[in-house]
Amino acid sequence: MLARKLGISADYLETGSEIRDTDERELQIADAELELRLAEITDEAEAKLKRLRADALEAGDTVAASRANIALGLAAAHGGRNSEAIELLESGLELSPVSASARPDVYATLGKAYAASGRPKRAVELFESCLAEVSQEAPDDFAAQVRFTTYLSYALTDLGDLRRAEEVLEEALGKAEEMTDAYSRVRLYWGVARLNDIGGRPAAALDYIRRAIALLDVTDDTLHLARAHILSAAILLTQDRPEEATRHHNLAEKLLGSNAEPEDLSGLYADQSKAAARLGNVALALAKAEAAVAALAGDEYPREMGLGQWALAEARALDGNTDGADSAFREASMLLEAHGHRREYVDVYRSWGKFLRRAGREEEALEVLERATDLAAEQVADAQAHQAE
């Protein structure tokens, strides 16, 4: 009654504050989240979120603690700390679950961290669950379904199940007329381009990535436009068109800026190294390959590290550093066979075998090339089995 007469809230009369502790905490978390997005160095914002998380847990405010954990997890993923990101995001979702429809970015980041850490099966399970959830909760939200269909196709491709990846994308393409927003089409075209590239169909891959780039050109989404140029360049390199690939690399580098994610930078540098090597620029090939490896910290991105080591091996071979090239080829083949796509590790074994043959190490070359042949034969057998089904 007194609060009403004075024109103030009961909380203010009791505490001297216009908002409750939970609201104040939520406001501070929102401020720290914004700082994370805008700041180049995020240490201070992360420290603030950790303090707020501790306060929230002490107060029994699980919603705020969850939000702080999720924000910290997203920051860890952006910094390439995938193991930490997985732990934080899983903990945040356990404290206070949020739906895939409400926070698709959280589930996308978690799945991406699983895949980057060499756990594609877990990523597939997550995205299958997300797709089922959004299909049930919002059957008319085709954009959300396309988002998680595309993520699922990525995870299936990483797992090596190209047939099922193709099936889920074909189903989405069949509903393409229902899409009204550009981003749904971009995601879908991107997924089809990536699948065709990995499946050894570069012409079809280029067709779809060009469609994605055309749509992204009319948006302000520079990050995804940069990634589209990187994928386009990678496809062009498979067709031995390094000059055209370099033009896409230059555009991507400008669009990424200085605050890019480690895997984006490493992938760009590795492909720039390969393009430079094919154009005979040894110094640039070495510099870019070394940058590709240096962009990744620890063992957070095993596949990307394998691709970086492969680029470094090619550059060292071109430079005449036989021992250094052999060491990098060995590391690349080990990482890519464990974490890469089959076409990648077949190709790295072939490249390594050709290098050993040029170096006069015929016995070692024969062993490596036999390994490449065996892996390629498995790939053909799998493809024939899928066709028979």
Go through each PLM region and give its residues:
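DNA major-groove recognition helix of helix-turn-helix/homeodomain DNA-binding modules
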Residues: 1-12, 18
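C-terminal non-catalytic interaction modules
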Residues: 3-6, 301-308, 318, 322-389
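Tandem amphipathic alpha-helical repeat scaffolds
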Residues: 27-41, 66-80, 102-119, 144-160, ...
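Helix-turn-helix repeat elements of alpha-solenoid scaffolds
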Residues: 37-51, 77-91, 118-130, 161-171, ...
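Short coil/turn linker motifs that delimit alpha-helical repeat modules in TPR/alpha-solenoid proteins
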Residues: 41, 60-61, 98-101, 119, ...
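Mid-protein regulatory/catalytic core that forms ligand/cofactor-binding pockets
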Residues: 47-167
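Amphipathic alpha-helical segments of tetratricopeptide repeats
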Residues: 50-57, 90-95, 128-138, 170-181, ...
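Eukaryotic tandem repeat interaction scaffolds
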Residues: 209, 215-338
